[in-house]
Design a protein with these regions (language model features):
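Internal intein/HINT superfamily modules and their associated LAGLIDADG
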Residues: 2-20, 24-258
Length: 258
């Protein structure tokens, strides 16, 4: 007999079902496991089912109701590293970046557990919220399977350059790297993306007056976007400092001012 398995959206434990109908019903309701439903942290309301808990209060609403450089940073970060599937959102980072995941969780007032995955040595947060996820995907023109389906940059032209630079910084922290470029004071930012994102990056960099260096990786569907002028790298780092942005410090500390 087949066994149907899903993950508790609150604690990450596997929940096993004998019958497919029970599995589908629980999936639709985003039900939590028995341990979590019995926990003192669960909140039950009249008219709700037993497993209908506070998990639905998690949302990404702050990312489209409070527009700021920090908000656009996080939007760029989840464009790079976040995952959207139906009414579900997930963000997973390696163990070394757990603190950064906790900062994001704090920013969106995430109330569930951040779950450790031993097989990948990573941490993740995840939740379902039909209204909130639909709203943010619509507001920022984010598509499902976003690796291959880029956002339309024209949907971002109403943002000023400070917000767009914050967006780029978030993308760099999610999909980019910062490395030495041959000498002590020389560095290079490299972003790797599917070739379908070429127009998006070309328009974003052009709007920010950053020289466009985009090349296709031979034999693949991948492009690399490079930023290496020292005055631009220092400007970006000063922008981070002046706006007190929460970023991945291990990356930006590579750029030295002297």
């Amino acid at each position: 007999m087949n066994e149907y398995i899903r993950v508790c959206p609150n604690c990450g434990r596997e929940i096993k079902y004998k019958w497919k109908s029970d599995f589908l019903k629980a999936s639709r309701k985003c039900s939590i496991c028995k341990s979590c439903s019995a926990s003192k942290y669960s909140i039950f309301k009249i008219g709700h089912h037993l497993n209908d808990s506070i998990v639905r209060n998690n949302s990404l609403d702050r990312l489209y109701t409070e527009i700021s450089p920090q908000t656009l940073y996080w939007v760029g970060f989840i464009i790079a590293d976040g995952s959207f599937y139906k009414n579900r959102f997930e963000l997973s980072l390696s163990a070394k970046d757990k603190e950064h995941l906790e900062r994001f969780a704090s920013y969106i007032s995430y109330s569930n557990n951040i779950v450790y995955r031993k097989n990948s040595n990573s941490y993740r947060l995840f939740f379902s919220n039909k209204q909130s996820i639909a709203a943010i995907m619509n507001y920022y023109n984010i598509n499902y399977d976003k690796t291959y389906n880029p956002v339309n940059f024209d949907s971002y032209t109403h943002f000023n350059k400070e917000l767009l630079l914050s967006l780029l910084i978030g993308i760099i922290d999610g999909d980019g790297s910062i490395q030495s470029n041959g000498s002590k004071r020389a560095n290079i930012i490299t972003i790797t993306a599917h070739k379908n994102w070429k127009t998006f990056y070309a328009k974003l960099l052009s709007t920010l007056n950053i020289p466009i260096h985009i090349s296709e990786v031979k034999g693949t569907n991948t492009i690399t976007i490079r930023i290496y002028r020292r005055e631009i790298l220092l400007y970006i780092k000063h922008f981070i400092i002046n706006n007190n942005l929460t970023v991945l410090e291990r990356k930006w500390n590579i750029i030295k001012e002297n």
